[in-house]
From Swiss-Prot:
Keywords: Amino-acid biosynthesis, Branched-chain amino acid biosynthesis, Leucine biosynthesis, Lyase. GO terms for molecular function: 3-isopropylmalate dehydratase activity. GO terms for cellular component: 3-isopropylmalate dehydratase complex. Disulfide bonds: none annotated. This is 3-isopropylmalate dehydratase small subunit. CDD domains: IPMI_Swivel (cd01577). It comes from Burkholderia thailandensis (strain ATCC 700388 / DSM 13276 / CCUG 48851 / CIP 106301 / E264). Belongs to the LeuD family. LeuD type 1 subfamily. Heterodimer of LeuC and LeuD. HAMAP family: LeuD_type1 (MF_01031). The gene is leuD. Pathway: Amino-acid biosynthesis; L-leucine biosynthesis; L-leucine from 3-methyl-2-oxobutanoate: step 2/4.
Length: 216
């Protein structure tokens, strides 16, 4: 998992409440057994004018010119600004995969759905909760200034705006540690690989019958 320390990026404003996971990555794209390739289909039903299916050549599909991510000023955005209850709906880890593979490193919103919120951390995508008043101000700034950027300093737990304003945010010490070091669940486990091997060797020596396989 990619480490997250300080990130500066263009902000894209998704001015909709209750954006659910089916909007983030529609159900037909969940058939893949791979963990990659979801970025081109993030927000598929809003992003394109036709119906998308797995395996299509997205470069040949008609884009929706009214959708925010198709507007030139936001096409290189890496910070998503959203409204309350972002990521609601069914539980699918494909949603943070799609957003991250699109190019987003962080999402700022007044609130997130719990499962989506947790899945973001597990996949190196930083969800930041600010107040509705703060988010409203950032929407206004994003609309007012072309190429509006924010700097997110995870170590300091603050979002810095170009006008000098700072927006502190909360994050647990464990989640912060994992993001700063690029540890997902597997990475955390592998840090203890030698202890795991030692335990397995001792277990096998003391209880060898547990390793026997039934035949027939």
């Amino acid at each position: 998992m990619e480490k997250f320390n300080v990130h500066t990026g263009v902000v894209a404003p998704l001015d909709r409440e209750n954006v659910d996971t089916d909007a983030i990555i529609p159900k037909q794209f969940l058939k893949s057994i791979k963990r990659t390739g979801f970025g081109p289909n993030a927000f598929d039903e809003w992003r394109y004018l036709d119906h998308g299916e797995p395996g299509q050549d997205n470069s040949k599909r008609p884009l929706n010119p009214d959708f925010v991510l198709n507007q030139p000023r936001y096409q290189r955005a890496s910070v998503l600004l959203a409204r309350k209850n972002f990521g609601c709906g069914s539980s699918r880890e494909h949603a943070p995969w799609a957003l991250q593979q699109y190019g987003f490193r962080a999402i700022i919103a007044p609130s997130f759905a719990d499962i989506f919120f947790n899945n973001c951390y597990k996949n190196g995508l930083l969800p930041i909760v600010l107040t509705e008043q703060q988010v409203d101000h950032l929407f206004n700034e994003t609309y007012a200034f072309n190429g509006y950027q924010l700097t997110i300093d995870l170590d300091a737990q603050v979002v810095r705006a170009p006008d000098g304003r700072e927006y502190p945010f909360e994050i647990t010490a464990f989640r912060k540690y994992c993001l700063l070091n690029g540890f997902d669940d597997i990475g955390l486990t592998l840090r203890h690989a030698e202890k795991i091997r030692q335990f397995e060797a001792e277990r096998l020596a003391k209880q060898p019958w547990l390793n026997n396989k039934l035949v027939g």
